[in-house]
Amino acid sequence: MAHALLIEELDSLQGNDAMKTSSFWKAGHAPTLLAAFFYFDLSFMVWVLLGPLAIQISADLQLTAAQKGLMVATPLLAGALLRIVMGVLVDHLKPKKAGLIGQVFVLASLTWAWLGDLSQFQHLLTLGVLLGVAGSAFAVALPLASRWYPPEHQGTALGIAGAGNSGTAIAALFAPGLALAFG
């Protein structure tokens, strides 16, 4: 008897979970949530780019250990500080426009990194500050995702958007090989 009640209770819980999952996807805007995830993912790839490339860059420019550490830390610190600026932009311009402005800076920075002269340490630090704009993606992606979902689903929405942190692993896996292949 108790066993049957337990099975019945478990079945009802599974049904509720299925309903919750279904209602989550109906409650918000999945394309915006996926866009927030990809925005976050790509931003994280760019933000941490100097870390996976540090060995190659430090060998090419004969950087000291301290210089290499500063080079890797600069985009992280800049990103942390630029989140405040990006947050203000998000509040005034809304996430889409603020994100577009951020991406223009990021694309310009990547173009300079690829085609420009980064033969001096100061140039690397400047690039690091500019790449920090990608680190401000928190202030764009999270409001973009959460504004489309009611409070009871915001944890799930933010979890999905926040999974864009996986961009750090993707950068570590692919950036060194791409740098060797394309410069």
Give, region by region, the residue ranges found by the protein language model:
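Extracytoplasmic
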Residues: 31-63, 86
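C-terminal ends and interior cores of transmembrane alpha-helices
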Residues: 104-118
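Cytoplasmic helix-loop-helix junction between adjacent transmembrane helices
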Residues: 127-164
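Cytosolic juxtamembrane N-terminal segment immediately preceding the first transmembrane helix
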Residues: 2-39, 43
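Helix-to-loop junctions at the C-terminal end of transmembrane segments
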Residues: 82-94
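Primarily marks hydrophobic transmembrane alpha-helices of the MFS/SLC 12-helix fold
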Residues: 96-99
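Helix-loop-helix hairpin linking two adjacent transmembrane segments in secondary transporters
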Residues: 161-183
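Residue-level signature of mid-helix packing/kink "hotspots" within the transmembrane helices
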Residues: 48, 76-84, 136, 169-170
